Amino acid sequence: MSRFVQDLSKAMSQDGASQFQEVIRQELELSVKKELEKILTTAPSHEFEHTKKDLDGFRKLFHRFLQEKGPSVDWGKIQRPPEDSIQPYEKIKARGLPDNVSSVLNKLVVVKLNGGLGTSMGCKGPKSLIGVRNENTFLDLTVQQIEHLNKTYDTDVPLVLMNSFNTDEDTKKILQKYNHCRVKIYTFNQSRYPRINKESLLPVAKNVSYSGENTEAWYPPGHGDIYASFYNSGLLDTFIGEGKEYIFVSNIDNLGATVDLYILNHLMNPPNGKPCEFVMEVTNKTRADVKGGTLTQYEGKLRLVEIAQVPKAHVDEFKSVSKFKIFNTNNLWISLAAVKRLQEQNAIDMEIIVNPKTLDGGLNVIQLETAVGAAIKSFENSLGINVPRSRFLPVKTTSDLLLVMSNLYSLNAGSLTMSEKREFPTVPLVKLGSSFTKVQDYLRRFESIPDMLELDHLTVSGDVTFGKNVSLKGTVIIIANHGDRIDIPPGAVLENKIVSGNLRILDH
């Protein structure tokens, strides 16, 4: 009789279903452990230690995944955060700046999350290398911003890129172009975890390679991995040794996430004398943000609650703009000393995000991830700061790209600011159809970016192209039905117009 069957019969005779499940769990953990050990034997000697750390990290995550079942929050315990735990930005700004700005800046490290590819916008390679404004990429703008700070205040703020195995090689190739910039640039890699078969829960990978048949067998486990991989890289200790105190973490595709001197001053000179270990920038929800994670009070601490954690019966309540008015921008300010302490105590607690995927061959897999902001509850004296919407300017689609390329924004030292010529501070709602999804197609359809200073809403669907010097105002809806094509002529001014049908402009 196999050991598994013996265990099973023993379990059944003892405590029924729960005991049975526990045995199954233990067997699964043992099977996964054996599979991971097999994979580790295929690692080349120079990658062995690094791979072992990754696989050990995955085993811990997998163990937690097997323990947790159902929504990870008890809805009855969720409360609105107390007034003083989320401060308005105006109050932080009113404290002004210190006499010596460079002294606080020299305590800062800027970390950009650079693990993502540009696939959702039809681009190969790292998303950070997509051109967003005047030929400048996300990475160019980031370097320009920090160089401007270092030159203006005679400081040494370094830039750190958290790459993934998907982006590391291409990013490193491009970094040499910044050799003469006044910014020290460091990189470290996110962990690389194995995807698991949805049915068997065993790793899909058979060896450490991530090419050939193994291309889809591995994944970067979400930005919550920053704490462990930053610590393991040795950079955390290096920066603490240099006297750095805080990291400012943000997504590289959020063009609003610039270093804010008022927030930094608040951290370095806390008004109540109690150092704040974690600041999350939040901003007011609009209808477009209803799925964003929100800050709540939970068991006496600030806690980030994501839509995936909410019991189904309460999802509509979670999306309510009146009850939960703010959402997480993923601009975070975190104490380096606190990260070191919590990492060494194994005390950083983040909910697991179970992300189902289907591989090209049709195999259903899951990947286990964590989110950087979810760790807020592990830090002491955490704070939310309700910042202006201008600090949240993510470019996820070509619709977002159209906004940041337009005359709605002006570019100065790598930072985008809303044009003073726009009469209202809100950003227009832009929805470009599937013909515009890929950057290449999008660029082909605009001879030049339209004037959008007075635009409120733009919807474009179907085969549509724009000539030079087009001006869009109010609400503009352009719909070319299947088989039709619409060419908006050069110099056209469309104000509160619906354009449909067929409009071809041919060269004479």
UniProtKB/Swiss-Prot annotation:
What is catalysed by this protein? Answer: alpha-D-glucose 1-phosphate + UTP + H(+) = UDP-alpha-D-glucose + diphosphate
Residues binding substrate:
G115, G116, H223, N251, I252, D253
The biological process GO terms on file are:
glycogen biosynthetic process; glycogen metabolic process; UDP-alpha-D-glucose metabolic process
- Name the Gene3D superfamilies on file: Hexapeptide repeat proteins, Spore Coat Polysaccharide Biosynthesis Protein SpsA, Chain A
Where are the Phosphoserine modifications? S13, S434, S448, S461
Q: Does the keyword Cytoplasm apply?
A: yes
Recorded metabolic or biological pathway in which this protein acts:
Glycan biosynthesis; glycogen biosynthesis
Residues given in the record as Mg(2+) binding sites = K127, D253
PTM Blocked amino end (Ser): at which residues?
S2
Q: Which InterPro entries match?
A: Nucleotide-diphossugar_trans, UDPGP_fam, UDPGP_trans
Q: Which residues carry this modification: N6-acetyllysine?
A: K438
- Keyword check for Cytoplasm: yes
Q: Which UniProt keywords apply?
A: Acetylation, Cytoplasm, Magnesium, Metal-binding, Nucleotidyltransferase, Phosphoprotein, Transferase
- Binding positions (UTP): L113, N114, G115, G116, K127, Q190, G222, D253, K396
- Annotated region (Critical for end-to-end subunit interaction) at 502-503
Coiled-coil stretches are none
State the active site. Answer: K396
Subcellular localization(s) per the UniProt record: Cytoplasm
**EC number(s) of the enzyme?**
2.7.7.9
Q: Which domain of life is it from?
A: Eukaryota
Tell me the protein family, please.
Belongs to the UDPGP type 1 family.
Can you state the subunit structure given in the record? Homooctamer.
Q: What is this protein called?
A: UTP--glucose-1-phosphate uridylyltransferase
